[in-house]
Amino acid sequence: GKSIPDRAVEELDRIGKRHLQENYLQSVRLIIGPGEPTKNLKQSAQISKVSIIKAMTLQKLVELKAKYPGAINLLELKQYLEPGQIDDKINEYIAKIEKEIKLRSHIIQLVKRHLEKTGAKDAQVGNLCIAYLYDHPPQNLKDKELYDILIELSSPLTGYLGRTKEDDWKKDRFYYLRDLPIN
């Protein structure tokens, strides 16, 4: 396949400085292209602090964003944009996000199953913490960590769970609203 021309970094520098002027050095510089970058391109990217990513890796990131609109935190993603080839770093970030989504989906299903089994309309945090321990959790969570995720899932922005707030966080009650599909 084709590779990115060696002079791509120099062209990006020249055009970027012309259009962005004093903002150029603070801006994120990214080259998207096919194949492996040449040795010279990698060296230029390191010197000019330009990240290089394959189109397929970018596509995975875009598909994740399309499927789970709120899942990608741009400030967090920016930490993965290092000078040079960054496909491994971006794939690491995608895997981290997918793991977080699976955990949240598991917790939503836990609430749903708990309410089905108990016949209750909602469940107290303490009961959900115990249920989580016995539900083959994908990762260990402290009670407060589980509570924080329950809060996130009950936010009006996500709307997967509902919440009845009490005077103590351990007494807050949660109920199921909708699934978070994963595949």
Kindly label every feature range from the protein language model:
Residues 14-15, 19, 37, 121, ...:
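Aromatic-enriched hydrophobic runs in primary sequence
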Residues 160-183:
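C-terminal engagement modules used by replication, chromatin/transcription, nuclear envelope/ESCRT
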